[in-house]
Amino acid sequence: TNIACGTARLGLKSAVITGVGEEHMGRFIREQLQREGVNTDGVKTDPDRLTALVLLGIRDQEQFPLIFYRENCADMGLTVEDIDPEFIRRARAVVATGTHLSHPQVEAATIKALELARANGQQTALDIDYRPNLWGVAGHGDGESRFVESDAVTAKLQSTLHLFDLIVGTEEEFHIAGGSTDTIEALRAVRTVSKATLVCKRGAAGAAAFTGDVPDSLDDGEAGPGFPIEVFNVLGAGDGFMSGLLKGWLEGEDWPTALKYANACGAFAVSRHGCTPAYPRWEELQFFFERGITRPDLRNDAELEQVHWATNRAGNWSSVRTFAFDHRLQLEEMEGYTLEKGGAFKELCLEAALKVQNGQ
C-alpha cells in the first residue's frame, strides 16, 4: 500500500491487489488509498481475517524495533481466484513483494498475476523486502532483523526471479536471494537465474543498478546522486525508494535519473516520521531538486514542509462555514434571559442547522 500511494503521489496511475479485514482498520486503509488516488478495485474485504498490523518502536536514532501482527491476516489470504486477468491487463506493470512469496496460497496468487503480466508483454518488478520472521526463520520478537541465512528462502526466491524485469533489494536482501553473504557473489548468483535489471540499495551510499554482467565492485554500477540528510525514522524508506524508482523506470528515464528520484524519495521517508504521510508529491520533489537541501532534518525545513502540506491536503474545500451557538455571557446579559429560554434558543439553532444540512 505504501508503494501504491507513493507512486500515485508522483503522478503514476496506481492500483493495489491486497486484502483487508471487515473492520475499522480495513475500512480506513481502503478509504485512505482512495484519498491518495489509488484504484482499490483489487482490494478484497475478508470477513474471516483481520487486517495486517505492525507496531513500530523508536529506541534511539539507529534502532527501530517492529512487531508484526500478520499471522493468517487478510492480505495473506489472497487466492488465485482473487486475481482478475482483465484487471491485470489494464496495467502497465505489476510489482510484487517478496513477503507474498512466503506462503503457498498467496504465492500462487502472486505468480498468477506475474505470469499474466508477462503474457501480456507488461513489465514486472520485485521488491525483495526480506523480513526473516515473516518467512518463519526468526521469532516474533525479531521484527527488526533484516537478515537470517536460509537455504529454503533462497531456493524459493530463486525459483521466481526469472519472472521479473526489475529486482530491487538491499545488500542483505540480495544476500538471501543469491545465497551468499558476499554481495558481488550474491548479485552474480541472481544474474544466473534472471536477466532483470538489479538495483542494489546501499543506504547512505545511494544505490547501484546493473543491467548486464555484475562487475567486481558495486561502485561500477550505474548510480544516481545521494542526498545527505538526517536519519529520523527508517520505516518506510524502502517503499519510498521503490516509488521514486518506479516513477523513473516506467516513464523511460535513464537509470541515474530513476535512482535520483528513488534516493530523494527514500531521503524524505527517513527524515520524517511515518511512511506514506512522509512521501512527496511530484511538485514537492521538483521543488526539492531545484532548491536543494538547506538543512538535513527535512521535517523541520519550514519552506519544504509548506510545499509538502500544500500539495497533500485531502479534499477540495473551497470554503468552510461555521455556525457557533455555544454559550456566551452576552446571552445572560439580555433583558428577560432565563436558562430555559437559553436552552430553547440553542435547540432552535440546532434544528435550523440540521434542516440546512438536509437541504431544507
Model-found features: residue ranges?
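Conserved N-terminal subdomain of the carbohydrate kinase-like
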Residues: 13-98, 286-295
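Conserved beta-alpha-beta core of the PfkB/ribokinase-like small-molecule kinase fold
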Residues: 93-189, 196, 200, 204-213
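Short, conserved phosphate/pyrophosphate- and ester-handling motifs at nucleotide-, phospho-/glycolipid
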Residues: 7, 170, 238
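Alpha-helix C-terminal capping segments
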Residues: 2-13, 56-58, 248-250
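Alpha/beta catalytic barrel-like cores
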Residues: 295-360
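Hydrophobic anchor at the start of a short beta-strand
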Residues: 13-14, 40, 122-124, 198, ...
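Conserved phosphate-binding/catalytic region of the ribokinase-like
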Residues: 115-119, 179-303
